[in-house]
């Protein structure tokens, strides 16, 4: 994996500028700025590196939205580089404007949910969790079970 990755980044025909940089952007009517940290900045591209268990055939929507924030913040073409044991699969993120609109819509949906009440637990009860999803750890599952009154 290390050799594949090393060879891949050595072959990029673009001037390297910076690593682990910060972007801060304003999106639409959202009252707080979006802050993100990209992995690699080149003269013409901003790249985010993702390690994955298997080779990817395309960019996930969440990663495309993340890279689009970096693109707006840097003014560069966004790329996601998926690194697996078999090599590097680089993908250019297309439709940055559409992805930024999705970020804004998600933020507005969250803002609407939070506007229902000053009580965060009431806001949480506006949705119902899928505790079978891998993202839930044991500690957060216990808290969720308490909030949503879910049995074992």
Pin down the residues of each PLM region.
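Soluble or luminal CAZymes and related metallo-dependent hydrolases
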Residues: 1, 62, 102-105
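Metal-dependent nuclease catalytic cores that hydrolyze phosphodiester bonds in DNA/RNA
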Residues: 1-38, 136-152
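Active-site-adjacent loop/helix micro-motif of nuclease/hydrolase catalytic cores
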Residues: 55-63
């Amino acid at each position: 994996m290390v050799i594949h990755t090393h060879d891949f980044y050595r072959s990029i025909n673009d001037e390297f500028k910076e690593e682990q940089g910060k972007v801060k952007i304003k999106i639409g009517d959202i009252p707080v700025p979006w802050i993100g940290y990209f992995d690699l900045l080149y003269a013409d591209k901003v790249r985010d590196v993702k390690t994955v268990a298997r080779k990817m055939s395309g960019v996930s929507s969440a990663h495309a939205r993340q890279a689009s924030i970096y693109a707006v913040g840097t003014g560069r073409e966004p790329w996601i580089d998926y690194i697996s044991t078999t090599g590097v699969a680089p993908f250019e993120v297309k439709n940055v404007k559409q992805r930024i609109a999705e970020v804004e819509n998600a933020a507005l949906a969250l803002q609407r949910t939070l506007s229902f009440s000053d009580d965060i637990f009431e806001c949480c009860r506006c949705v119902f969790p899928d505790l079978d999803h891998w993202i839930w750890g044991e500690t957060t599952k216990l808290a969720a079970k308490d909030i949503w009154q879910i049995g074992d």
